[in-house]
Amino acid sequence: MHVLFIIDPLPLLKAYKDSSVAMMQALQARGHTLSVALQGDLYIDAGEVRTRFAPIALRDGADLHGHDWWRETGAADEAPLARFDAVVMRKDPPFDMEYVYSTHLLEYAQQQGARVFNSGAAIRNHPEKLAITEFPDLTTPTLVTRDMARIRAFHAAQGDVIVKPLDDMGGTGIFRLQRSEPNLNAILETLTDNGTRTIMAQRYIPEIVKGDKRILLIGGEPMPYSLARIPLAGETRGNLAAGGRGVAQPLSERDLHLARTVADRLAGRGLLLVGLDVIGDYITEVNVTSPTCFVEITEQTGFNVPEMFAVALESAAG
C-alpha cells in the first residue's frame, strides 16, 4: 500500500515516543510505502480533493532522539487523495476551524473514493470532550455550558469539580475547583471568556492519583493493556504532556467493560483508532483525532501496538 499521513511537521515530532512514527515504522516493516502531508497541503481544485505530499522512508537504525530519522525518497508532488491506498489523519489538536475545514475536505475525498482513517465525518462528529456525553451511564456527573451561574451551581452541588476547555489537548487549561476555591469566578471568567466560550465541568474523581488510563481501541478491539498516566505530586492532571508518568497495566474487568461498550456503540462509524481516557470507573474522554501511547505500552509490555494498527489498517483499506 501507499499510505499518506497527514501530520504535523516531522522535525517537530519527538520521534522516539511518537505514536505516528511508530505506525510508520510498522507499516514500512510490512513493505508499505509512506508519504506525508501537512494539514495546509490539502486543497480542492475543480471539485477534486488533492494534496501536496512528500514521499519518505524511515532510516534503518536511526536514533529517534535525533533529527535524521527520516529521509525523502523523491521529489514533492501533488495528487488526489483517492490515489493513495490509505490516508491516515494524524494532525494533533487544537480542534479549531482549520481542523474542521480539513475534516470536510477528508469527507469529500472519501466521497471521491479515498480511504481515510479516521474518517473526516467521524472526527468531526466525535469531539473529544463532548463525545462522552453519549455514554452518561459510563461517566461521572458532567455539565457542558458557557453559563457561569450554571457552572457555579454545579460546583456547589458537587463540591469538587474539574473544569476544562473543549478544544485543547495535553492537559492545557484544566483546573480543579474544590469547594473553598477562592479564585472560582476568575477561573470561570477566563475559561469561558466571560460567558462566551463553552466548557466542560465534571465531578472530580479521586482515583486520578492512581492514574488517568489510556485504553486503545483498534479496529473495534480493545488492546489488552492501558497506560496509566500518573500525575506528579500535587498535580490533578495525569497527561504525559503535563509531566505525568506512564505505567502500562493490564485492563481490569471494569476497563474491559467500558472499552467493549464504547466499541460496540461506535462500530461502523469510521473510527479505526480510538483512545479512551478512564479515571477510576469512569470514561472522561473519547479521543479520535490523534490517540497516542503506542510506544509506552509496547516498550513496557512487549505487546506490539503499532503492528496491531498496521494489520487493522491493511484490513480496513482492503
Curated annotation (Swiss-Prot):
Domain called ATP-grasp: residue spans: 129-314
GO molecular function: ATP binding; glutathione synthase activity; metal ion binding
Residues bound to Mg(2+): E285, N287
Known EC number: 6.3.2.3
Reactions listed under catalytic activity: gamma-L-glutamyl-L-cysteine + glycine + ATP = glutathione + ADP + phosphate + H(+)
Cofactor names: Mg(2+); Mn(2+)
Entry's family note: Belongs to the prokaryotic GSH synthase family.
Entry keyword set: ATP-binding, Glutathione biosynthesis, Ligase, Magnesium, Manganese, Metal-binding, Nucleotide-binding
The protein's name: Glutathione synthetase
Gene Ontology cellular component terms for the protein in this record: cytoplasm
Pfam families: GSH-S_ATP, GSH-S_N
EC class of the enzyme, as a word: ligase
Domain of life: Bacteria
Pathway where it operates: Sulfur metabolism; glutathione biosynthesis; glutathione from L-cysteine and L-glutamate: step 2/2
Sequence positions that bind ATP: 155-211
Cofactor note: Binds 1 Mg(2+) or Mn(2+) ion per subunit.
